[in-house]
Every structure is written in C-alpha cells, then in structure tokens.
Amino acid sequence: MTPREYHHPTAEEMSLTRVLGALSDPTRLEMIRRLADGLEHDSLELADDLPRSTLTYHTRILREAGVTWTRGEGRAC
C-alpha cells in the first residue's frame, strides 16, 4: 500500500492567524504539549479520549496551519 501524501505549507504559505487559530483550541493545544518532547508519536497517543474522526480533524487543522508534520505511514506524526 502506498503511503498517503499530505500537503504541508511552506514557510511562505504559513500565516500567524492560522497558526494561532490552530493553537486556540484546548484539545489541539494539549496535543502540541504531548508533542513538545520532540519525539515522533502515533496520532492516537495525542488525545486518547477522542474518537478517531475527531482526532483526524484536529491533526488536519494543525498540519494545514504548519504546526505539525504528518507522515502517511501508519499513524505516526
């Protein structure tokens, strides 16, 4: 199976408004706190109390804002 490819904004495409908007949600902010150790994490580790569909939504918002990088290999990001 071919890994899924995601769009990640370049530095020029990023905007402060989008980054701050992505971080304004308490759930996404907690996800970033968990990522702050600098290690790679399985996406399901980021918010273990959320349904997968909700978690996918939040990881997409963070990725599209340029806050996180998602690798389409399993669920690690």
Language-model-detected regions and their locations in the chain:
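Short, Lys/Arg-enriched N-terminal segment that forms or immediately precedes the first helix
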Residues: T2-L20
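N-terminal helix-turn-helix DNA-binding core of bacterial DNA-binding proteins
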Residues: M14-T54, E73-C77
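Short, hydrophobic-biased segments on the C-terminal half of alpha helices
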Residues: T59-R60
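Beta-hairpin "wing" of winged helix-turn-helix
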Residues: E64-G74
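A ubiquitous, low-specificity "background" feature that marks scattered single residues
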Residues: M31, R63-E64
